[in-house]
Swiss-Prot record:
Glutamine amidotransferase type-1 domain ranges (all copies): 9-207
A UniProt-annotated Pfam family: NAD_synthase
Native source organism of the sequence: Salmonella newport (strain SL254)
Ligand binding (ATP): 235-241
Keywords assigned by UniProt, alphabetized: ATP-binding, Glutamine amidotransferase, GMP biosynthesis, Ligase, Nucleotide-binding, Purine biosynthesis
Name the record gives this protein: GMP synthase [glutamine-hydrolyzing]
Pathway linked to the protein: Purine metabolism; GMP biosynthesis; GMP from XMP (L-Gln route): step 1/1
Catalytically driven reaction(s): XMP + L-glutamine + ATP + H2O = GMP + L-glutamate + AMP + diphosphate + 2 H(+)
Amino acid sequence: MTENIHKHRILILDFGSQYTQLVARRVRELGVYCELWAWDVTEAQIRDFNPSGIILSGGPESTTEENSPRAPQYVFEAGVPVFGVCYGMQTMAMQLGGHVEGSNEREFGYAQVEVLTDSALVRGIEDSLTADGKPLLDVWMSHGDKVTAIPSDFVAVASTESCPFAIMANEEKRFYGVQFHPEVTHTRQGMRMLERFVRDICQCEALWTPAKIIDDAVARIREQVGDDKVILGLSGGVDSSVTAMLLHRAIGKNLTCVFVDNGLLRLNEAEQVMDMFGDHFGLNIVHVPAEERFLSALAGENDPEAKRKIIGRVFVEVFDEEALKLEDVKWLAQGTIYPDVIESAASATGKAHVIKSHHNVGGLPKEMKMGLVEPLKELFKDEVRKIGLELGLPYDMLYRHPFPGPGLGVRVLGEVKKEYCDLLRRADAIFIEELRKADLYDKVSQAFTVFLPVRSVGVMGDGRKYDWVVSLRAVETIDFMTAHWAHLPYDFLGRVSNRIINEVNGISRVVYDISGKPPATIEWE
């Protein structure tokens, strides 16, 4: 019997903050399972989930508006600790008899919170002390409204100059509210506060660890599929690779991986995937060379969205044909991760919901009635990587920069041709190799090369050449929602440019993209 790693669990109710997924990731980092649900869940759903504690997230609305979101009243009757963050604190205060008002000044950015009285939430936690010995906390504020009167059975634990109730608490009921964001790194002791709430106040054990997650996933896969055969589309990306390794550990040769080589991958990537998963790890893997098929389908197409659809359609066609060749396959495995589940629920309903199967299968043939196996669907990306390391996958592969699903199909601008892909592959490999050599690869969030269908005059020796242009792109970002262009050293950029122009016959000019997001997107197409 594997240990029940879901035994202690935190429920996070999402009021729409951009930081809500970060709250969930922080709780997971503390070794405790949690789920993210929409704020309007029913009492029955909460009872069924049986949380050890509940966190109410921040949100963009104003609690003073008539129809603004409210926590289900049962949250405060369930007999478990509750932690309100920003909007979550405000709705807690209002629903329990306090008062919230719109503030004249919006408080955004760093603030110092002075701790006024003892509380289990912040006992022994401080960044500095006032002249008379009171603890101070450096926190990150982002709010317009503020609590102006707390419920009668609460106490004011901490304040700022403009916010009289920066922390409030009812120690007996174990209800806590903070007007700042403990989940962001700018709140220096935020992780300790979350740990205090989750581990001490809610008394959750650290059961959610990579090794235990693997044991649990393997047991669940075996229970779900038994002795049946499973098929997986393996791309060589993080999610499908970790899915393959988990399934291989659980069911061995009953897993068949199909690797579709679409001709739009990075330099030597197909060989690396086959070497690692076939030769090194011994997975049962079918290599399908399909470059000509993809490129002929893309011929003459310039529109980025149309290119994406063509690549997706042809992949499904090729994968289906291979699946039909295999006998007795009952299950399709997918590398769906928790943010996919949250996003698909949000796109359907406008908000996060309970974990459900995330059917992104596309167009499996009608005659193939397969069940779906999604061993990563409870996991965030950082957890998937940690599990991959535990399963023996190489660090460089797991922590590689993001690569788009359509691959070079959206990094060759306009029509995709084999000549362009070959040039781009070689130029990009030089850029990435130099980033690694200069110890810059892990200092940027994403770096890649784009092929521009533009010819430019160059000089090589005594002759002129009229060849293609590529653009280098490197960005720094935390969440990929916004990004700054990376200020790479000029001598480094010069070295990369010289190598590409000298070593890749067919490229005469290299430019560097200095656009932020917004207004530009990270990828060009």
